[in-house]
């Protein structure tokens, strides 16, 4: 007997789950964001991203396949005419899930799933993290000298650890004040 392989079902059965995911994705496409439980948002994300990928192909066959899944003509029109051209150059990553706290009634973790429609540029590796000057750390470069260890300096120039106060506000007598 075949068993579900995509994790636990959100609703009573697979047919009802497909209907719930279709309705939630239609709301996501019409409103650009949706507040729901965290588990539902995680189940909705791949479902919605596959529909966006299908809409990027365009064409009548893709439109009819998406309509058979969505069952909402307004959401289908929004998906194919407004959303698909904005994400045409991107390969995935069309949605973002943000945790927003807990529901007041039963304490269920809530999340906001939203479409990422602003253009995202490709990352440039390492150019932002490189320093402006290159520091030579080869075998010829010497480490920075430790203060007091230069030739010609006396060892008595540095204060002793047991005579110097640890805290600037602390007195050197180390007496405790009892109140």
Curated annotation (Swiss-Prot):
GO terms for cellular component: cytosolic large ribosomal subunit. Residues 154-168 have a biased composition (Low complexity). Keywords: Ribonucleoprotein, Ribosomal protein. InterPro entries: Ribosomal_bL17, Ribosomal_bL17_CS, Ribosomal_bL17_sf. Residues 127-179 are annotated as: Disordered. GO terms for molecular function: structural constituent of ribosome. Gene3D superfamilies: Ribosomal protein L17. Residues 170-179 have a biased composition (Polar residues). GO terms for biological process: translation. The keyword Cytoplasm does not apply. PANTHER family: LARGE RIBOSOMAL SUBUNIT PROTEIN BL17M (PTHR14413:SF16), RIBOSOMAL PROTEIN L17 (PTHR14413). Part of the 50S ribosomal subunit. Contacts protein L32. Belongs to the bacterial ribosomal protein bL17 family. This is Large ribosomal subunit protein bL17. The gene is rplQ.
């Amino acid at each position: 007997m075949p068993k579900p392989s995509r994790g636990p079902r959100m609703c009573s059965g697979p047919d009802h789950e497909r209907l719930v995911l279709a309705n939630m994705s239609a709301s996501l496409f019409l409103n650009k964001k949706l507040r729901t439980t965290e588990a539902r948002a995680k189940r909705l994300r791949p479902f919605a991203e596959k529909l966006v990928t299908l809409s990027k192909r365009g064409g009548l066959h893709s439109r009819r396949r998406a309509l058979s899944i969505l069952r909402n003509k307004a959401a289908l029109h929004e998906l194919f005419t407004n959303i698909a051209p904005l994400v045409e150059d991107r390969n995935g990553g069309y949605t973002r899930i943000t945790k927003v706290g807990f529901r007041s009634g039963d304490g269920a973790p809530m999340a906001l799933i939203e479409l990422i429609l602003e253009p995202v540029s490709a990352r440039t590796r390492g150019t932002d993290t490189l320093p402006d000057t290159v520091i030579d750390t080869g075998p010829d470069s010497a480490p920075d000298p430790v203060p007091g260890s230069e030739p010609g300096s006396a060892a008595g120039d540095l204060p002793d650890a047991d005579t110097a106060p640890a805290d600037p506000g602390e007195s050197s007598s180390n007496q405790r004040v009892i109140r």
